[in-house]
Amino acid sequence: MSDIKVAIIGAGSMAREHIKAFAAIPGVKVVGIQSRTASKAQALAKEFAIPKVIEDLKDLYTETKADIVVITVNILAMLDVAGEVVKHPWVCLFEKPVGLHYAESVQINELAKAQNAKCYVGLNRRHYSSTKTVLADLALSDEKRIINVFDQEDPYIALHEDKQPALVVENWMYANSIHMIDYFRVLCRGTIQSVTPLVHWDSNNPSLVVTKIEFSSGDTGIYQAVWNSPGPWAVTVTTHAKRWEMRPLEQASYQLHGTRKIEPAPVHEWDKEFKAGFRLQAEETIKALQGLPHALPTLEDSLETMHLIKAIYEI
């Protein structure tokens, strides 16, 4: 059986983590890389023995005949890159978010549908061993769940220290809060029935955002974000019998009813050796390519998370 071939678009830190994850799977080869910054692409190609550095994105498929392409470009380039990659018969794995904002995500989704492209999104926290552990335990009970998601964002740091483009920072709830808001769609059952802002987003004075989300299952989500103030990235899931907490997100711990002791759950070795979630995500991408059951979110699935962000922030 021939090797599964993977191509990479982009040459930043995320590209590097994807290369490591795919290259670790037996029978998978990273065969080409393309980036607007050729020197970075060449450096990664040298480090990971990638045989081809492609100058023009339009030549990437014909030069590599890759089975999978991983798109790790800056959000501002996502629309143009998506318009090109969906033309080819490979499986597309997009880094999140797929678009600068909800409207652009809709546009990209329409481009993919028009080409009948196979598109998935790297919402890697869905593949954390902590997330999998919590979901497996919750599946054993039909008790109602209260999911609290705690978000913290620093747009000033993103703009001035991390040198993110101003337009990206203006849409920072899509660019970065997607990491946290997607947890509602993973941990809550059923469909969203209502999104009720309790403390409204103020774009002129980014501070506190609190929103209640009701699901058809009876599950309730509470989103609390602090902007330009200290706070954790954390998730809790409370049922009558047990409370789960992920703080940090890579570590799940639980507390049983009637006790005060917090018990940590084991963390999978893959989440220590690779960027958390990436190794399993790569495996799931291979399954999607092979037509096997898999846990990758589709482009349309991620669009629902983008829509939830829009509703929470009333934008």
Predicted regions span which residues?
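Rossmann-fold dehydrogenase core element
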Residues: 107-124, 142-147
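Predominantly a Rossmann-like dinucleotide-binding segment in NAD(P)-dependent oxidoreductases
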Residues: 125-195
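Beta-loop-alpha module in the N-terminal Rossmann-like domain of NAD(P)-dependent dehydrogenases
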Residues: 39, 48, 52-111
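C-terminal helix-rich "cap/oligomerization" subdomain common to oxidoreductases
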Residues: 1, 68-73, 117, 216, ...
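Contiguous beta-strand/loop segments that form the cofactor/metal-binding neighborhood of enzyme cores
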Residues: 175-251, 283-292
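Active-site loop of classical SDR/Rossmann-like NAD(P)-dependent oxidoreductases
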Residues: 269-283
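Hydrophobic residues in well-ordered beta-strands that form the structural core
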Residues: 94-95, 119-121, 246
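N-terminal Rossmann-like dinucleotide-binding module
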Residues: 1-48, 185
